[in-house]
């Protein structure tokens, strides 16, 4: 009855409490709750997934549209996170096989539909349309809109950092969109800001677009592309800012600049850390060990976010009456199966897509674009083509084949065709003020 006793007990992290008069069933439930919780949760989660497994398998065996693919990917991600928490490794392996089958079917779906989509026929929301369709409608002169593009953020990584963000923000729309191909920053993110497809960007801005073989940064003109896009969309008179964060020190400086951004109609912030993390995992042994699989990769993302300037930036935005759009340019996939490719020295280095001439490859491993201009992709010469790796494959040259197979196996790569790379989050939120 003493409130102070209860407060002190709860503050001391007691496991549970019983209210007199105590019944035997209360004692049994309290013991079960504290001793058997993990086992009971694991059993219930496993049972629920086994039921859902059949539903997902039936869906995969049918002909699905783009919205159904989004739902399947959401479900697979949900169960991946749930089973990870429950710790049932045997069921996690079954889910892994189901995801592999889903990616195999998704690859066929993309091969059959991508060219129509890129021409605007029955297309899902894609990279080059998100500013026009999802950002500009929120812009006003009385309330700032923030667009945060976290490079290389997969849907599962979003679900991991989401609970922390929702302490200060309310979700208005939790949506997916489809990245263009290649699922690489120079193509996808330039398309986002310019509101055009790559060959259209090259035509409009020949001095600003860089092809794979060109030296120098490939995303150096995003601000110019953004402002040109806003001008074409009738928002040229609106105040807009663009900020790219590529290191910790600059991120901390941006935290202090957020209060001054509230008078702008649109503030775009590009955050590069997650992309650097995936590339570092290939190059650095210590990162390889920290992020050995998807679960560890998610854990590393959560740890980074909790201690990053991005979290502080969001805390500052939360103090304003503002709209917030969080999205990304593409995802990434853990690659495990090598596919041999032969090409001349001008072929690009990416392991998930190749462009060039005189390419030799196994046709069943790739989505090939023999006429890239039909897919709005720039070409180096008239005989250039693009190929994209399917599922969790990665391209390896014939020279030093075994050495490179071993080096790149179980690393995170992007540029190809998979659900993880192409189906990506775009979340519309508002502050809780």
Predicted regions and their residues:
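As written
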Residues: 9-15
């Amino acid at each position: 009855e003493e409130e102070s006793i209860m407060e002190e007990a709860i503050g001391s992290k007691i496991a549970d409490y019983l209210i007199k008069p105590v019944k035997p069933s209360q004692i049994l439930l309290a013991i079960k709750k504290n001793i058997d919780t993990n086992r009971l949760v694991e059993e219930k989660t496993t049972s629920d997934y086994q039921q859902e497994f059949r539903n997902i398998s039936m869906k995969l065996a049918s002909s699905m549209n783009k919205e159904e693919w989004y739902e399947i990917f959401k479900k697979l991600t949900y169960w991946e996170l749930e089973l990870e928490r429950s710790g049932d490794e045997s069921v996690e392996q079954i889910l892994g096989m189901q995801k592999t089958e889903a990616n195999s079917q998704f690859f066929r779906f993309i091969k059959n539909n991508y060219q129509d989509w890129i021409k605007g026929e029955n297309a899902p929301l894609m990279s080059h349309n998100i500013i026009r369709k999802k950002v500009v409608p929120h812009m006003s002169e009385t309330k700032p809109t923030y667009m945060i593009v976290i490079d290389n953020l997969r849907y599962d990584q979003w679900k991991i950092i989401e609970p922390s963000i929702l302490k200060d923000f309310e979700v208005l729309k939790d949506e997916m969109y489809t990245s263009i191909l290649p699922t690489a920053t120079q193509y996808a993110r330039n398309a986002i800001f310019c509101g055009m497809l790559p060959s259209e960007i090259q035509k409009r801005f020949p001095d600003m677009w860089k092809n794979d073989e060109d030296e120098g940064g490939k995303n150096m003109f995003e601000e110019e592309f953004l402002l040109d896009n806003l001008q074409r969309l009738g928002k040229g008179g609106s105040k807009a800012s663009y900020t790219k964060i590529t290191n910790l020190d600059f991120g901390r400086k941006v935290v202090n600049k957020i209060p001054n951004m509230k008078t702008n109609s649109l503030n775009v912030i590009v955050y590069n850390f997650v992309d650097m993390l995936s590339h570092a995992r290939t190059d650095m042994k210590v990162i390889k060990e920290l992020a050995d699989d998807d679960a560890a990769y998610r854990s590393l993302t959560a740890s980074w976010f909790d201690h990053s300037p991005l979290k502080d930036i969001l805390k500052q935005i939360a103090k304003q009456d503002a709209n917030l759009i969080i999205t990304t340019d593409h995802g990434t996939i853990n690659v495990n199966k090598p596919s041999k490719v032969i090409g001349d020295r001008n072929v690009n280095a990416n392991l998930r897509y190749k462009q060039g001439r005189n390419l030799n490859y196994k046709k069943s491993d790739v989505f090939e674009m023999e006429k890239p201009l039909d897919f709005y992709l720039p070409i180096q010469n008239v005989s250039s083509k693009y190929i994209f790796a399917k599922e969790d494959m990665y391209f390896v040259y014939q020279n030093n084949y075994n050495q490179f197979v071993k080096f790149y196996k179980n690393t995170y790569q992007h540029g190809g065709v998979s659900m993880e790379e192409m189906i990506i989050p775009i979340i519309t939120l508002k502050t809780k003020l």
